Amino acid sequence: MADPAAPTPAAPAPAQAPAPAPEAVPAPAAAPVPAPAPASDSASGPSSDSGPEAGSQRLLFSHDLVSGRYRGSVHFGLVRLIHGEDSDSEGEEEGRGSSGCSEAGGAGHEEGRASPLRRGYVRVQWYPEGVKQHVKETKLKLEDRSVVPRDVVRHMRSTDSQCGTVIDVNIDCAVKLIGTNCIIYPVNSKDLQHIWPFMYGDYIAYDCWLGKVYDLKNQIILKLSNGARCSMNTEDGAKLYDVCPHVSDSGLFFDDSYGFYPGQVLIGPAKIFSSVQWLSGVKPVLSTKSKFRVVVEEVQVVELKVTWITKSFCPGGTDSVSPPPSVITQENLGRVKRLGCFDHAQRQLGERCLYVFPAKVEPAKIAWECPEKNCAQGEGSMAKKVKRLLKKQVVRIMSCSPDTQCSRDHSMEDPDKKGESKTKSEAESASPEETPDGSASPVEMQDEGAEEPHEAGEQLPPFLLKEGRDDRLHSAEQDADDEAADDTDDTSSVTSSASSTTSSQSGSGTSRKKSIPLSIKNLKRKHKRKKNKITRDFKPGDRVAVEVVTTMTSADVMWQDGSVECNIRSNDLFPVHHLDNNEFCPGDFVVDKRVQSCPDPAVYGVVQSGDHIGRTCMVKWFKLRPSGDDVELIGEEEDVSVYDIADHPDFRFRTTDIVIRIGNTEDGAPHKEDEPSVGQVARVDVSSKVEVVWADNSKTIILPQHLYNIESEIEESDYDSVEGSTSGASSDEWEDDSDSWETDNGLVEDEHPKIEEPPIPPLEQPVAPEDKGVVISEEAATAAVQGAVAMAAPMAGLMEKAGKDGPPKSFRELKEAIKILESLKNMTVEQLLTGSPTSPTVEPEKPTREKKFLDDIKKLQENLKKTLDNVAIVEEEKMEAVPDVERKEDKPEGQSPVKAEWPSETPVLCQQCGGKPGVTFTSAKGEVFSVLEFAPSNHSFKKIEFQPPEAKKFFSTVRKEMALLATSLPEGIMVKTFEDRMDLFSALIKGPTRTPYEDGLYLFDIQLPNIYPAVPPHFCYLSQCSGRLNPNLYDNGKVCVSLLGTWIGKGTERWTSKSSLLQVLISIQGLILVNEPYYNEAGFDSDRGLQEGYENSRCYNEMALIRVVQSMTQLVRRPPEVFEQEIRQHFSTGGWRLVNRIESWLETHALLEKAQALPNGVPKASSSPEPPAVAELSDSGQQEPEDGGPAPGEASQGSDSEGGAQGLASASRDHTDQTSETAPDASVPPSVKPKKRRKSYRSFLPEKSGYPDIGFPLFPLSKGFIKSIRGVLTQFRAALLEAGMPECTEDK
C-alpha cells in the first residue's frame, strides 16, 4: 500500500526502508516490487529502474517483510505463503520463531486456510495481530528481503545470472521497548539476546554429545513491592495479568516462552503466590482478597528434555557410548552449550529479545505512557511513524550517494541530533489526520538533505525515537484499549512455536488463555486514567525487553566466480528456489566422474571458481598425506565441466551445518580434555579446509577428514523421542492444501497430507481433521479394506518371528488390527456401513459414515505400517507386501525400451489372451505384445511370491489387461509377459521425438499385486546411469506417477479399479518423457515462462541429454535378454541417428557463435538474462498478463498430471499456453508490469539468433555441455562399433 508518510515519488527512499529480519530457516527472498503511480492506493515499491527484468521474476517470496493497508491503516507483515508453495512457511520454523505474529487469529486466518492461494496473491501475516490474509502482490511494498547465511541468491539488477552464497548478514533493527511507545534505532541484531537461555528446538552440546531440546520447564523470578523475591513456575505465572498488555496477546499470556520478560509488571490474586518458593525478603501476608503487583526480575530454565543425536570424538572423555540422561536438571545446565553462532541472522518482525545498553551511549532518560496503545488501529499508525522516522535518514543517505549501496554504517545518527529527530517526529504525528499524499514538508526534506552524512565506517550508538502522541487521540483510544483487553478469542492471541511440535502454526496454548476478571478490568481502567508519564533512567549495561518492529538487512555474498561482495542490500537480491544439481560454488568438495580420470578414491577436488554461463568449474585436486595431518595438491588447477563432477559423498559442508569432530586435529598438538567437539560450519575455504565455530564460540580451521556432518541424521532423528513431550497441537495444525500423499502400499491415503508429524504411539495418534465434504466411491472404500488386509497378511507371519524381542504392546495392537481387518475383508461397503450406498454429495458440516469408515481403515493401515517398520528381522524373500525396488539384491543388467520398427513375428490378434509362449500380437499401430515361456531370473519382482487370494478373479483381470495391450498399444511401446508368472510384465518405451529422450529406449519391470486392480501395479524403472535423467524416474527404480499412487493426483489421475496398465504406460510416454522435463519436478511448474525457469529448464536438458547417451551406451554393451533382439535392431539405425543429430547441433552452435562474434561488438548469445528494456519490449506480443487463472501444473502439484487413457493427448498440449491470466491493475505503470510470463521458450532466445527449433530448449550450448557430450559420444560410438553396428552412409 502507499505509505502516506512517503516523500515524493522522486525520492528512492522506499527501496531502503528498514524491514524485519530474516527467519531462522533459510528462506527465499523476493524480487523487487514495482512502483505504482503515486496516486494509487497500491504499494509504492522501488522505481522501475531498480526492478528485475520485466516479466522475468517473481515479486515476493516467503518470509519477506512487506507493508500494506490492513483495516484502514498501514501495517507491517510477513509473507507466509506464495503461489505454488505447498504449505505455510512457518510450518518449517524452529523454536525461536516470531513471537508477535507467529499465530494467525480470526477470520483472516481461517479464510486463508480454506481458500487456495491464487496466482498473483500471497498470504500475509499482519503485525502485530497475527491475522493472515490473501493480498495481491502489487498491493504490497517490499520492505526487507529475508536472507540468512547459506542462502543461494542472484543479483537482481545485474545482467549476470550467476548465483552466489550468502556468507554473512548484518541486520539493523528498530526495536520497541515492550509495554512502552519508545523506539530505539538502529540496534544491530548482534546486540540482541534471547530472553530465554534455551528454547524448544535448540541444538545443544553436552560434553561430547549433540542433542536437541524437545521440552523444557521454566520459572520466573518475581520481585514484590516490599522487596521480597520469589520463584514461580510458568503455569502459575499464566494466571497473572500484564499491566501493560501487548496488542498481539490482548492481556493473555499466549505462551510460557514468550509471555514473560524481565521488567514486565504483573498483577494477580494472592492465592496464586501460595505455592511459590520465597527467595529473600519478608514474605507478605496472603489474604484471600489482596492482590499483588510484581515485577519480573528474571526468567529461568530449570529443566531440559533432550533427544540425543550422536557422540563426537572426545579424547579426554569417557569411552562409553551410552547417551546422557534425557532430562538435564538445573544443576547440570551449566555444562550445556547452545549452538547459536548464527542467532543474529534470525531476527524477525515481532520477535521479543533483550537489549543491553552499550557503554558508548550516554545515560538516557526515557519517558513513556503505560499501557501502550492496545488496539489494532493504534498499532497500525505506529507502522507509519516508524517508517517515517527511519525514512528521513535513508533519504539523506541516498541523496549523498545515490550510486552506491547504503552502507550499514551510514544508517547511524549522532545522538546529539536525537532531540531534533524526536521533535520532528512528534510534530509529524501529532495529528490523527494525515495529509493525503503523506509527504513531509519541503522545508523538512530540505533540512534533512542538507545534513552531512557520517563517514563510512564510523560507528555511532543507537538513538531513541519516541512516538509522538496527541492527548485527544490517547483519550479516544481508551475505550478501544479496554475492548481489546477484554477480547478473549483467538483473533488477536498468539501462540509461540515453543509449545508446538510444528513451531508456531498451531492453536495450542489455549489452556493459558485466561479471561480477565471484571475487577482486573476495572483496575486497568483506573490505571489508564492516571495518565502519568513514567520515567526511567537507563545506564550502560541495563537490560531491557524489546520487540523488533522493523529491520534492514544487508548481506555479504560469495559469487560463483569466487568474488566476494559485501554490504549488499537484501532487497537487491532474490533467492534461487530451485538450484540445479550441477551448480557448484567455491569451496565445494567434488569427485571426478570421468571414466579416464584417476581411479584413486582418496583424491578429491575443491572448486575454486565457477563459470555459470559456460557450465565449467576451476578445480584443484587434493589427497590426504600419509601422516594424516595435511593434504597435498595433485597436479594443476583444471577447468572441468560441471557434468563431469559430482558432490563428494562424505565431504558435504555448507555454512550453518552442524558438525562433530571425529578425529585428531591436524597439528598433532596434545588434546585438552575440555576441547570442544560439536559446532557449526562458519565457512568452507577453497584451500580444502573448513572453518568451524564450536559450541564455546571458539573457531578453528580443520580438515574435512576430521569432521562429520550430521545434518542427515538430524532430519531422521529430530523427533525420535518427542512422544514423551506434550504437544498441545490442535488437529487443524496438520492440515495442508495439497491433495494426498503416498503410502508404502500404493494407496492414496489422506485428503490432507501431514506436515512433518512426529511419530506418536499407534493408538494415540491425533484424529485427522474432518473434511467439509467428501465423495467416496464403492471402489475406493473396498480398495481401502483390501489394501489394509494386504498389508496385514504378511505381517501376521512376522509375529512368530519377532518372538520375545518384539514390543508386546505393538503386537497386541497388531493382532487386534488384523482380526478387525479380516472380519471386514469379505463384507461389502453397504454391509459395513449398514446403510444406503454412498451418495455423490454430502452435507458440508456432517462427515458421512463412509468417511469415518475410511478414516478408521486408514488409521489401522498406518498403525500396521509403523509396526512393520519397527520389526527389522524379516527376511526379504518372505515379504509379500509391496516390494521395495530399492533393496533388490541383484540389479538386472542394463535394459531399455523399443521403437516403432520392432519386428512382429506373428501378426495375430489375441481372441482369448490366454497367451501361448512365443506368440506375438501386433497392435494396429504396429507395436508388439508377446508372451514368453519363462520370466528372466533378473526381473525386479521375480523373487516376490505370487499367491492371489482370489485366483480366478485375478486371472480374469489379467486376461482383460492382455487383450487391451494386444490391441491398443500406441506407437513406441512394447510389452512382454511370461507364462510361468502371469503377474509379471516387462515394457520398453521409445523416447518421443523432439524431446531430449528421442532415439533412447527406457525399460520397466512391472508386477500386478495380488489384489489387482484394487491397487495399482508396481513399476520399477531399470536405470542405466548414475543419477536421474528425468525427475520422475529415479535411479533406484522408483517411478513417480499419480496413477501409481507414488505422487499426488486428482480425479481421473488417481488409480481406480477401472484403471489399466495401458494407461500407466501411456502416461509415462506422454507425460514423463517430455520436451521440458524440468517442470515435472514438484512445484517447479510455477517457474514456467519466467527467466529463471527457462534457464533451469535449458540446463536440465543438457544434463538429460548427457545421461541419455550414457544410458544408451550401457544398453548397447549389456542388453537385457528379454529385449536383446529389439535393442540391437533399434540401435543399428537409431544409435547413429542420435550421434549424428547431436553432432549437427555442436556444429551449428560453433558456426553461429563465430557469426555472432563478428558484427560490431555484438555480444555472442548467452544464457544470461536480457537487459530490462529488451526483456520488456522484445516479446511484448508473446507475453500474457497473469493474475488469476490456474497455472499449468496447478491441477496437480506433483510431478505429472496425466489423465488416464487421455495421457497421450494431453502430452502434446502446449504447457505454456495455460499461463494466461487477467490483466494487472490499471494503476500500475506499463514499464513495471508484474511477473509476465512468456508463451514459448523460444522467446527467451535473442532475436535473429539463428538457433534451430529442435523442440526443446537447449541453445545456446554451454562450454561445459560441449566438453561432456563429446566425451560420452566418443564412448557411445565405440560401443556401437564393438556391438557390430557400423555406421551406414545413408544414416547421415
From Swiss-Prot:
**InterPro entries, sorted:** UBQ-conjugat_E2_core, UBQ-conjugating_enzyme/RWD
Modification type Phosphoserine: residues: 50, 87, 89, 399, 401, 441, 515, 836, 839, 896
**Which residue stretches does the UniProt record annotate as biased composition, category Low complexity?**
38-56, 491-510
Look up the EC number in the record and give it: 2.3.2.24
Where in the numbering of this chain does the UBC core domain appear? 953-1113
GO annotations of cellular component type: cytoplasm; cytosol; nuclear body; nucleoplasm; nucleus
Extract one GO molecular function annotation from the record. Answer: ubiquitin-protein transferase activity
What does this gene product do?
A: E2/E3 hybrid ubiquitin-protein ligase that displays both E2 and E3 ligase activities and mediates monoubiquitination of target proteins. Negatively regulates TRAF6-mediated NF-kappa-B activation independently of its E2 activity. Acts as a positive regulator of BMP7 signaling by mediating monoubiquitination of SMAD6, thereby regulating adipogenesis. Mediates monoubiquitination at different sites of the nuclear localization signal (NLS) of BAP1, leading to cytoplasmic retention of BAP1.
* Main enzyme class: transferase
Tell me what this protein is called.
(E3-independent) E2 ubiquitin-conjugating enzyme
> Acidic residues composition bias: which ranges?
478-490, 732-742
According to its UniProt entry, the protein's GO biological process terms are: positive regulation of BMP signaling pathway; protein K63-linked ubiquitination; protein monoubiquitination; retrograde transport, endosome to Golgi
- Gene name for this UniProt entry: UBE2O
UniProt note on tissues of expression: Predominantly expressed in skeletal muscle and heart.
As stated in the Swiss-Prot or TrEMBL entry, residues carrying the post-translational modification Phosphothreonine are: 488, 491, 838
Compositional bias per record (Pro residues), positions renumbered to this chain = 1-37
